[in-house]
Amino acid sequence: MKTNHINILLLMAVLFGFSACSDDDELNAVSVFEDVTQVEKNEFDNWLEDNYRKVYNIDFKYRYSDKESDLSYHVIPADFEKSKALAILVKHVWLEAYSEAVSTDFMKTYVPRIIQLTGSYKWNGNGSQVLGTAEGGLKVMLYGVNELDIDNPRINTSNPYESHQVKPIDMNYWFFHTMHHEFCHILTQKKEYDPQFRSICAATYHSTDWINMDDKKVAKEGFVTSYASSEYNEDFAEIYATYITNTPEGWQLILNEAGEEGTVILNQKLDLMKEYFRSSWDIDLDHMRDIVLRRSQESVSLDLRTLK
């Protein structure tokens, strides 16, 4: 009997709570959650239609979506204004770099069909931070969008060992390195790279303890980052993303840390990677790097608050 009275009281409290919501409550007109019903398009939605969907066949999702998210992690929605800024940056620095180096049709064919933004990062059980993921070449998830400083965009291309805690955040590390890395995975899933690459460091990968490794230390073993030392597919993608987002001087800093033995290994891997992109995709990696670096420099002068 006591239970029934409690249930009735709880029901009344819930109903009262709903009725107490005032019509005068001020809410942002733009929802950060994706509704199952058709939402009215705003200016940003129309811009994405013209610059992403029509040109590259990409559905750029900035509203939080349960079906696009991994519900086993606690994350928050991406900020609306920062989503706009990142969409402008991704278009200029990433999409148009490949369009310039290869073609727009190439990107339209191979880019993921969905780019989903999330405001916060997600963390694995081993303490590692997930910056982005690619799912079968169909979707790329980008995390930590709310860390972007719209008025002080910064892309570090000269020091691969800069602290990741520096503010404003380095968009290369937190976004573009990740996007190049994940796109490399997509391409290698379409066309396999030389299996010789796998054997170069077969005995030295840190499959279970890479998170405890130091970037400078693993350079001596022939890895550009600690994550590269986790396994050969990540190794390949990390070399690619690191090479094209760093100046020759930045790459040389890695070789300096690698020493003679590590440099031999890194150059061996780099040669195989360059040949793969040249023969499989007709991409000259040094030309690609020049374009990426130029567009990275241009990004700091972009108006990230105005859709054009």
Language model features: what each stretch is:
Residues 176-218:
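Acidic, glycine-rich loop-and-strand cores that form catalytic or ligand-binding grooves
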Residues 1-9:
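Bacterial N-terminal signal peptides that target proteins for export
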Residues 142, 156-194, 237:
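Active-site recognition of the HExxH zinc-binding catalytic motif
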Residues 72-80, 147-150, 161-170, 174, ...:
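Second-shell loop/turn segments in exported
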Residues 16-20:
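C-terminal motif of bacterial Sec signal peptides marking the signal peptidase cleavage site
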Residues 26, 84-149:
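Auxiliary, metal-adjacent structural segments of Zn-dependent hydrolase domains
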Residues 5, 22-108, 261-308:
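Acidic/polar, low-complexity intrinsically disordered N-terminal segments immediately downstream
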Residues 204-308:
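Metalloprotease/metallohydrolase-associated module, dominated by Zn2+-dependent proteases
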